[in-house]
Design a protein with these regions (language model features):
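A glycine-/small-polar-enriched, mobile loop at the entrance of the PLP active site in fold-type I
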Residues: 43-46, 61-80
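PLP-dependent class I/II
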Residues: 3-10, 14, 18-20, 25-28, ...
Length: 405
């Protein structure tokens, strides 16, 4: 009996989706670790803390109180109200509950907005380095991602002049994160004002401000383009609880923006997932309204780790690395080590090659900057114990010393 197997004809749109390199490297490092190898995983993009106890207790109480049914697509009134209050009191932003939609993580919020706003052929400006999923999201909607380059010498920030030079009649959106994943750079008030002065001259450009790392900011006050009244009605803030509250597994994100965009996102989300988890939503209310001491503690620990890890990497020759003002990543430039040869005779032509070498020989998992739009860098997370970070720095230094010209 001969059975003929025929491949399923998958849709063309899948070609626009590139596998997340952060998830791929994390998976590879876990597989290696499962074989007994002592791998230090610095590729993962989540806090190494557990969710604060009061938030977990609130979830248990929510279940006891009957919050186990379908919630409204845009989110429970309790949470939308808590988010609006947070934005008003902490950020000075005049968003009401009707301006907010709660989604299954900030990634979901981003994709909702991009699908709601982008038509085929629209250009979306994304300052590089950028989060790995931005280009795929844009292409999935039929848009064209336009990367704006930066450098370690500029602290990985794009000037207002450079931003203006990339705007064309096809530009529909500006999408950026601050604090930035992967560089950790934070746009300050002066820099954002300069961007604002450019953007007011182009009223057809919508702005998506990804502020998921807001709570992990070592530079002082968090600043947002949404603070400028001149941009009102054409900007949306994307945020969530994953990073600042160590709630990555709860999948809680939100968009705050113009009501018509919220209504559009509600339609899209209603088609895909309906409302986000009701128990997690009630736990998130407690996160916003409860004590914030654990949030501050986590930020302080991250800052201490940043300082120690940056100092250790700075001892490695020819490895420029900015001192980030936010998030929990270092983004060193590895240009000097590209083109060198491993002891086994393999030439490391790209940052991808170098990351595989670090994992296989140094047993340190990092993510290539190629995925973030910066091919000469690698991303190293310091969401790990300080002892592990020091050990990782030693392994990286040794791996680099073993390379030959």
């Amino acid at each position: 009996l001969v059975v003929l197997l025929r491949m399923i004809a998958l849709s063309d749109r899948l070609s626009e989706i590139v596998e997340s390199q952060t998830l791929a490297m994390t998976k590879r490092s876990r597989e290696l670790k499962a074989t007994g190898v002592d791998v230090i995983n610095l590729s993962i993009g989540e806090p190494d803390f557990d969710t604060p106890e009061n938030i977990c207790n609130a979830a248990t109480q929510a279940m006891a109180n009957g919050y186990t049914h379908y919630p409204p697509v845009s989110g429970l009134p309790e949470l939308r109200g808590a988010i609006a209050k947070k934005l008003q009191q902490e950020n000075g932003l005049d968003f009401q509950a009707e301006n907010i939609i709660v989604s299954n993580g900030a990634k979901h919020s981003l994709l909702n907005a991009i699908l709601a706003l982008i038509n085929p052929g629209d250009e979306v400006l994304i300052p590089a380095p950028f989060w790995v999923s931005y280009p795929s999201m844009i292409r999935y909607a039929g848009g064209i991602p336009v990367s704006i380059p930066s450098s370690v010498e500029d602290d990985f920030k794009v000037s207002a002049e450079k931003l203006a030079s990339y705007i064309t009649p096809k530009t529909k959106m500006l999408l950026f994160s601050s604090p930035c994943n992967p560089s950790g750079s934070v746009m300050n008030e002066t820099e954002l004002k300069a961007w604002k002065d450019v953007l007011v001259k182009h009223p057809n450009i919508f702005i998506l401000s990804d502020e998921i790392y807001e709570k992990i900011n070592y530079a002082g006050k968090h600043c947002s383009l949404a603070e400028y009244p001149e941009l009102s009605g054409r900007i949306a803030v994307i945020n969530g609880l994953s990073k600042g509250y160590a709630m990555t597994g709860w999948r809680m994100g939100y968009l705050a923006g113009p009501k018509e965009l919220v209504v559009a996102c509600d339609k899209i989300q209603g088609l895909m997932t309906s409302g986000a988890n009701s128990v997690a939503q009630m736990a998130s209310v407690t996160a916003f309204e409860g004590p914030q001491d654990t949030v501050l503690h986590m930020k302080n620990v991250f800052e201490k780790r940043r300082n120690a890890f940056h100092a250790a990497l700075s001892l490695i020759p020819n490895l420029p690395c900015n001192l980030p003002d936010g998030a929990f990543y270092l983004f060193p430039d590895v240009s000097h080590y590209l083109g060198k040869t491993t002891p086994e005779g393999i030439v490391l032509n790209t940052a991808d090659d170098l990351c595989l070498y670090l994992l296989d020989k140094g047993h340190v998992s990092a993510v290539s900057g190629e995925a973030f739009g910066h091919a000469s860098c690698i991303r190293l997370s310091y969401a790990a114990a300080e002892e592990q970070l020091m050990k990782a720095a030693e392994r990286i230094a040794e791996a680099f010393r073993n390379l030959k010209d």
